[in-house]
């Protein structure tokens, strides 16, 4: 007669681990904070507000519900703004956001306005006292378990890059250094990219942070060349993965993706479906990060991002032949 041993502690530990891994991961929420700085005159104030509204409305159309817009002049659009973009209000907005964001949520921050650089540190110009790059670094440190996409479109924004770059962050600046202090053209094209079919190079119905960056940078270069001027701004992106991670970030929930491949030929449709599956794997891996060995997480992430980059290239190559 064969006897069976009663389940021991190891069995129950393994069972609990299996159940934890099998449980569906919580959905990632997207949070957007848009800040416009001092315009200096009515023309610039109006322009910065116009861009901010375009970003806010684009995000809301795609299902982003947590949107905060702090404006230099809230009276321009009381229905859309949540307050004036003073140092105090910006700090409060970051602190409030840190209080409601869950682990693995995605935080998008966009600065639209003028910047400055005193030779030592950069700042974004606000009504009243400014916030420096170091100040924003302190605010971003509140988000230890979220991914941050921080887009500073201002002049001299390159001074923010080294201060803010780090694990779990994608930093976009309109200039490469703090010394590039001329008014930037980058923001107009970056905002335009969010709703541009031309920017959606992989035709998945959404524009990634990398696609918006590449689109805007290319448009800026073309504009300077067309006018015969020397390029005075060099946009920069740092996500720690040579842009591979930025290619998976969207200012839109995953469920908002259009069925871009529905009418594609079978070969292209297959590539699009494979690319979408890889994006899903990246998202699921990020949700499991806290329960994984750091080295294994980085190894698996690097493989997925490389596979995703190759798949995206294959899609573009196939479309280019048509």
Model-derived features with residue positions:
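N-terminal secretory signal peptides that target proteins for export/translocation
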Residues: 1-7
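Cysteine endopeptidase catalytic domains of the caspase/legumain-like
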Residues: 2, 25-322
């Amino acid at each position: 007669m064969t006897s069976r041993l009663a389940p021991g502690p190891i069995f129950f530990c393994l069972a609990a681990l299996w159940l934890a891994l099998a449980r569906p991961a919580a959905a990632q929420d997207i949070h957007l904070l848009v800040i416009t700085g001092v315009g200096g005159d009515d023309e610039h104030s109006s322009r910065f507000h116009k861009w901010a509204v375009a970003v806010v409305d684009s995000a809301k159309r795609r299902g982003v519900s947590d949107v905060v817009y702090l404006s230099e002049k809230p009276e321009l659009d009381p229905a859309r703004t949540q307050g004036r973009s003073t140092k105090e209000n910006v700090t409060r907005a970051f602190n409030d956001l840190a209080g409601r964001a869950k682990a693995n949520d995605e935080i998008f921050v966009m600065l639209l306005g003028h910047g400055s650089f005193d030779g030592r540190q950069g700042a974004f110009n606000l009504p009243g006292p400014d916030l420096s790059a170091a100040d924003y670094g302190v605010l971003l440190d509140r988000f230890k378990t979220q991914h941050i996409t921080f887009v500073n479109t201002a002049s001299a924004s390159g001074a923010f890059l080294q201060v803010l770059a780090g694990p779990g962050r994608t930093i976009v600046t309109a200039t490469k250094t703090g010394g590039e202090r001329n008014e930037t053209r980058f923001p107009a094209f970056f905002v335009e990219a969010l709703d541009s079919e031309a920017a959606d190079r992989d035709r998945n119905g959404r524009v990634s942070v990398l696609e918006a960056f590449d689109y805007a940078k290319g448009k800026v270069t073309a504009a300077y060349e067309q006018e015969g001027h020397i390029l005075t701004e060099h946009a920069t992106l740092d996500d720690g993965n040579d842009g591979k991670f930025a290619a998976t970030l969207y200012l839109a929930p995953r469920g908002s993706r259009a069925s871009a491949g529905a009418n594609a030929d079978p070969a292209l449709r297959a590539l699009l479906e494979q690319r979408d599956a890889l994006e899903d794997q990246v998202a699921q891996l990020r949700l499991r990060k806290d329960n994984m060995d750091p080295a294994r997480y980085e190894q698996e992430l690097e493989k997925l991002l490389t596979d995703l980059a190759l798949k995206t290239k294959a899609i573009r190559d196939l479309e280019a032949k048509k």
